[in-house]
Amino acid sequence: MRKFCAIICLLLITTPVVHAGGERKTLFPDLAPGLHLYRYDWAVETCVLYVAEMSRHEPTLHFEVALANAQVLGKETVRSMADRRTQRGDRHVLVAINGGFGVLGDMRGYGGVLENLHVQDGELITQPTDTEACFGVTESGEFLSTPVQMKANVQIGAHALPLGCINQRRLDGCQVTLYTPRLGESTHTNRRRGTEILISGLPLPLTPNYVHSYRVEDVSRDGNSAIPRDGAILWISTRLKDASVSKFNTGANGTLTLTLSPPEWNRVQHAIGGRIRLLKDGKINETLVEMHRAEKRHTPGKRASVLNLSHEPRTALGYNADTLFLIVADGRQPKYSTGLTLYELASILIELGATEAINLDGGSSSTFVINDAVINKPSGQREREVLNAVFITADIP
């Protein structure tokens, strides 16, 4: 059935339209009102892109994100995540692309951990780290891409500890991390590195703008604690020299306070973090501009040790006042598509009309799915399992 869908997709291509930067071939012209899908053959260099343009004014279309296997740990293909979302029955996934960066290997059990923001159906699953490269949509449909930070602390008695991470590896620099059931079955921590505190009484799921009391049920230094389905684990690094750590005793009560800043981010229903802001106010990231100018010799299609300057498969998300853009550029296939540098990717986004954009995970992860069929040609010759995904969904009547 999936092969059949892919064949049909290739047949449903309208007459090519030539633009200044290349040729556009519309795909599935009647798939949904307010949705424009096309293949874009970039004329400047050998690169093939797949683009979805969603009208922000079409009430039946929606932006969503999805977590692999519905938890942080583990990986899943974009197509499988889209299938699971459609099976819920209220909306159908029309377009799906791969999402953000994180641990693709095992990394001592942390395979699947995201490195940046992920909010799904109003649940805060991981906090923002690259604060410039985040995108979110509120329940009212407002698009947000302003720099965002998490401000959080864990109070115990008169003392407060800053909470730095949610569902992250202990190696990511945080001295206090909260693990919710959304991570997986256990924390995968090392017993020599910190103290783990089992807390109860926190209403789940965790959300932005969250304030609730909790009770300490257990304190352990064994590591890799099981995460209860109705509670959480607070991990505190042994490097944190704070007298308040000794206050976490069984039976003690405290308060967890969390908010995103600026405050409009507390209203997001779906949000995702990438790596590197490509566009802001219609202008390319100045760092990318400077790197492009400093490049001594630009060789089309060349891969480089500096990833920003290397021609690679790319995935990006952009928007303007009227349109959401999801883009995947194929690469590492010289006779078909060599890929793009990040400066080139940003330039194409401007050409298409985007004013704001962030870079998502690329390389072998870059995947573009329409109606359960992988449309692009992933560089690994097969669809890769990834960490999260971005959807355009449509209401099911």
Predicted features by range, described:
Residues F4-I13:
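Sec-dependent N-terminal signal peptides
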Residues I13-H19:
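C-terminal segment of classical bacterial N-terminal signal peptides
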Residues H19-P397:
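Gly/Ser/Thr/Pro-rich low-complexity, intrinsically disordered segments
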